[in-house]
From Swiss-Prot:
One of its GO terms (cellular component) is cytosol. Its cofactor is Mn(2+). The lineage of its organism: Bacteria, Pseudomonadati, Pseudomonadota, Gammaproteobacteria, Alteromonadales. Its EC number is 2.3.3.13. Mn(2+) binds at D14, H202, H204, N238. Homodimer. This is 2-isopropylmalate synthase. HAMAP family: LeuA_type1. One of its GO terms (biological process) is L-leucine biosynthetic process.
Length: 523
């Protein structure tokens, strides 16, 4: 048996079903090209019979993608298979994936047929699909709850009809690994022609077991895993592609299996899917979450500085990230602060470590996470009170035109003790307010990330705006809280402006230090 596991990505079919709004054809193509770079073997990109838009997107992707096999879904109906075949016909290589329910509850309650009738439909669908391609996949929907005798019979007959891949889905995420592994093992033991097809699994995450069930399945002989980027999909989602890829890579010695995934594309692909699907990745998500390579505990940070593999079983570089993160919090030890100052280019002679660490702990207790620009300001600026701001918002007035979508904002901003009033027109109230503040302050800041949340519940909830801004090749993080979203947005911007002002002051201090070093070096 081959030790190569086929990765069948269904982000653009099962994954898209979870979205509040459908992706455009252009967005689907972007994701498909990213999946091709990632190295997926097969990508299921839609259900052509379902709508003209889905048909168009499948056809566009089939025409464009060259290095992955493009697949489309169809029910066990000739009209579905016709639509799939027509949409895929422009591809160099393609697969038709047809399915029918096999569990008793589905057969009797949903299809209202006998199992023998369903079996006949399945065989007919596979034979019909084979008229268009040799690559036909057949799925036994709700296989996890299908009586094993019926499942074995269905698999044997589908293979006889010409299916070259047999998919065993845990459609409702009901089975546990030992149970699901037993199903796969039983198929290999009892289906006489099982060696004529690749056994695939498609596990859902309703009980949080989709990845575990998929890994158990390949340990029992399955050689295709159906999955999605970031695990998106129906209800609680699907088996996560990135988790499967890195499990098989990291534990290759134990499992003896491999994939064709280019792991260095994982982070980029995950970010693209998250952005286009408007589905943020939870911070503690395995492999691609913001905290996956972030260490906050002082003990862990100390271990990481001594040997990276003390607390990391894979490197961030392996999935396309540049580095891990040691979050500077009140739990960080002196060693971490000294290490970070060294990375920023400072020697022991440039600052007082005792004073810096004492001030750091005070600031960390106050704001939680301390960033590089905070640390440099603590080291080189005497006045570090955060309420002693260079910029202060005094007044904000916004008028919106609901018919045209434009808005006018007037702001009063205190700049170094003097009040400056400015107005601006923008594409919406936040844009107008940001332009007015920029005029008043003279600061041109590039906003790279904007997130809106809430603190509290009901009518008393505060809008929280978190922004990331780029200024002189450095990222700054600002937060604003207010009952009004526009006001919260402006407060976040003013927060960033004060951080960049301090950063400029720190840069002046750094320049003086360098000049003093040069003078001393020349003496």
């Amino acid at each position: 048996m081959s030790d190569r596991v086929i990765i069948f990505d269904t982000t653009l079919r099962d994954g898209e079903q979870a979205l509040a709004a459908s992706l455009t054809v252009k967005e689907k193509l972007q994701i498909a090209l990213a999946l091709e770079r990632l190295g997926v073997d097969v990508m299921e990109v839609g259900f052509p019979v379902s709508s003209p838009g889905d048909f168009e997107s499948v056809q566009t992707i089939a025409r464009t993608v060259k290095n992955s096999r493009v697949c489309a879904l169809s029910r066990a109906l000739e009209k579905d298979i016709d639509a799939a075949a027509q949409a895929l016909s422009v591809a160099d290589q393609f697969r038709i994936h047809t399915f029918i329910s096999t569990s008793t509850i589905h057969v009797e309650s949903k299809l209202k047929r006998s199992f023998d009738q369903v079996l006949e439909m399945a065989v007919g669908a596979v034979k019909y699909a084979r008229r268009f391609t040799d690559d036909v996949e057949f799925s036994c929907e709700d296989a996890g709850r299908t009586p094993i005798d019926n499942l074995c019979r269905m698999v044997e007959e589908a293979i006889k009809a010409g299916a070259r891949t047999i998919n065993i889905p845990d459609t409702v995420g009901y089975t546990v690994p030992s149970e699901f592994g037993g199903i796969i093992q039983t198929l290999f033991n009892r289906v006489p022609n099982i060696d004529q097809a690749v056994i695939s699994v498609h596990c859902h995450d309703d009980l949080g077991l989709s990845v575990a069930n998929s890994i158990t399945a390949v340990q029992h002989g399955a050689r295709q895993i159906e999955c999605t980027v970031n695990g998106i999909g129906e209800r609680a989602g699907n088996c996560s592609l990135e988790e499967i890829a890195m499990i098989l890579s990291t534990r290759k010695g134990e499992l003896g299996l491999e994939t064709g995934i280019n792991a260095k594309e994982i982070h980029r692909t995950s970010s693209l899917v998250s952005q286009l699907c408007n589905m943020p990745v939870q911070a503690n998500k395995a492999i691609v979450g913001a905290n996956a390579f972030t260490h906050s505990s002082g003990i862990h940070q100390d271990g990481m500085l001594k040997a990276q593999n003390t607390y990391e079983i894979m490197t961030p570089e392996s999935i396309g990230l540049n580095r891990n993160n040691l979050n500077m919090t009140s739990r960080s030890g002196r060693h971490v602060i000294k290490h970070r100052m060294s990375e920023l280019g400072y020697g022991d002679q440039d600052y007082d470590m005792d004073v810096l660490y004492e001030d750091f702990l005070v600031l960390a207790d106050k704001k939680g996470q301390v960033f590089d620009y905070d640390l440099e300001a603590l080291a080189f600026m005497e006045a570090q009170a955060e309420d002693d701001d260079h910029f202060k918002l005094q007044q904000l007035v916004v008028h919106s035109d609901s018919t045209e979508g434009s808005a006018t904002a007037t702001v009063k901003v205190e700049v170094n003790g003097e009040t400056v009033t400015e107005a601006a027109i923008g594409n919406g109230p936040v844009d107008a307010a940001y332009k007015a503040v920029a005029r008043a302050s003279g600061c041109e800041i590039d906003i790279t990330s904007y997130q809106l949340g809430a603190k509290g519940e009901g009518q008393n909830a505060l809008g929280q705006v978190d922004i990331t801004a780029s200024y002189r090749n450095q990222n700054f993080h600002g937060v604003g809280l207010a009952t009004d979203v526009v006001e919260a947005s402006v407060k976040a911007l003013v927060h960033v402006m004060n951080l960049t002002w301090r950063a400029d002051k720190v840069a002046d201090c750094k320049q003086k230090i360098q000049q003093e070093k040069q003078v001393l070096g020349g003496v």
